[in-house]
Design a protein with these regions (language model features):
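An acidic/histidine-cluster motif and surrounding catalytic segment
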Residues: 2-180
Length: 180
């Protein structure tokens, strides 16, 4: 899901990727100023706080969570397992969904912001990734990016049957003002 964008006319095979979107207000989405993305932040620029958007996949990488129909799984396994087996799975999914390298159209949908994210534990940031250098920085508190009520941070609360969750991204707007 990393790098996911809304489909636009500047992307490969853009004329074949539908640009429709479904939006809904979702209290589990943090306010838009908390949303971090590399480059443009379409969510912050185009939608009000707490908006979750469902749309066709565009420019996604990483494989935190995916769901496929049985037919889609068979097609993906045929494509990835027989034809492009030297590629990483996340790049295979990207090509499969974006019709790159002569691929046919597949109805791949996603949500922004993502429903699942990696949890970064308290400690050395270099432990976060085997492909990115975290340097010597130290994280004082664990965080799950863009997930307001992180399962990892609320596990004990859930197991105890409580509903007083740790809110990583509490609302900061003035309730008397209209949400922007």
């Amino acid at each position: 899901h990393c790098g996911m964008r809304f489909p636009s006319s500047t992307q490969p095979a853009s004329e074949k990727i539908p640009r429709g979107r479904v939006m809904r207000i979702d209290e589990t989405v943090p306010e838009k100023h908390y949303l971090r993305q590399n480059g443009r932040n379409d969510l912050e620029e185009q939608y009000q706080n707490h908006t979750r958007v469902v749309h066709y996949v565009s420019e996604g990488i990483c494989t935190t969570a995916y769901a496929l129909t049985q037919k889609g799984a068979r097609n993906f396994l045929r494509t990835g397992g027989l034809h492009d087996s030297a590629m990483t799975v996340d790049m295979l999914l990207r090509q499969y969904c974006q019709m790159e390298r002569g691929k046919t159209f597949h109805a791949c949908l996603t949500v922004q912001p993502a429903l699942f994210q990696q949890h970064h534990r308290e400690g050395a940031k270099k432990a976060d990734s085997n492909i990115a250098d975290g340097g010597d920085e130290y994280r004082k508190k664990g965080v799950t990016d863009v997930v307001r009520w992180s399962l990892r941070m609320n596990w004990d609360t859930l197991l105890d049957g409580d509903t007083k969750f740790v809110d990583q991204y509490p609302d900061t707007y003035d309730p008397g003002m209209e949400r922007r």
